């Protein structure tokens, strides 16, 4: 039987600190459930104890990525928070030019492809959507564009037929011929690579900021401000709390709330 590797309170706090430094994510409130889940994860890391794991985590690049993949895994689906997605497309169409959209984090691609199919339904062709995420496994899934039927439950049958190719194993693969250009990149929003992604008219950052501490939120707002075009908009999730900064002003519109670049 596999020996369980259980972290001490100090070791767990050190792990949470390392993850925060790497990604900005604050796992303090999830300490109890994290301790339980770590046992299973550590079985595949070839470490004798948690202290050895922490030592490797600080220097082993592959282990860093595997650990980030572990702590950021989550479920998502197509057309999530649909009203806001429609508002993004409504604004994009009003610009009457080529529109660049950033989805950060993009998870396994459902948000990016949801925006793309809504754009297609609104006859928007000149649009580029880039999805970035810190989790390597979800980025690979997004690039593949193959999904289980349950993630498409909010789509009509006609939408499924137009935008997906159904396989015999009951998986659905995105029909990219029907969509605007969608790309995906592995990227940490706090690393230098993020600043080189280009300029965007819209950033959709939904259900990520809620996991950041206050300092990381402020840093992220500055980074978002830097890559947005003038009057660019930031859309966040319903649970995301945005600190007041010099970079954005909060706008209340009949179609919902967004943040405009100052």
Swiss-Prot record:
InterPro entries: Bact_Chemotaxis_MeTrfase, CheR_C, CheR_MeTrfase, CheR_N_sf, SAM-dependent_MTases_sf
Membrane-spanning residues: none
Record EC number: 2.1.1.80
Keywords: Chemotaxis, Methyltransferase, S-adenosyl-L-methionine, Transferase
Catalytic EC class: transferase
UniProt domain CheR-type methyltransferase: residue ranges: 1-262
Annotated positions binding S-adenosyl-L-methionine: 76, 80, 111, 133, 188-189, 206-207
Tagged with keyword Iron: no
DNA repair found in the keyword field: no
GO biological process: chemotaxis; methylation
Pfam families the record matches: CheR
Stretches of the chain forming a coiled coil according to its record: none
Catalytic activity from the UniProt record: L-glutamyl-[protein] + S-adenosyl-L-methionine = [protein]-L-glutamate 5-O-methyl ester + S-adenosyl-L-homocysteine
One Gene Ontology MF term: protein-glutamate O-methyltransferase activity
Function statement: Methylation of the membrane-bound methyl-accepting chemotaxis proteins (MCP) to form gamma-glutamyl methyl ester residues in MCP.
Protein name: Chemotaxis protein methyltransferase
Organism: Campylobacter jejuni subsp. jejuni serotype O:2 (strain ATCC 700819 / NCTC 11168)
Lineage: Bacteria, Pseudomonadati, Campylobacterota, Epsilonproteobacteria, Campylobacterales
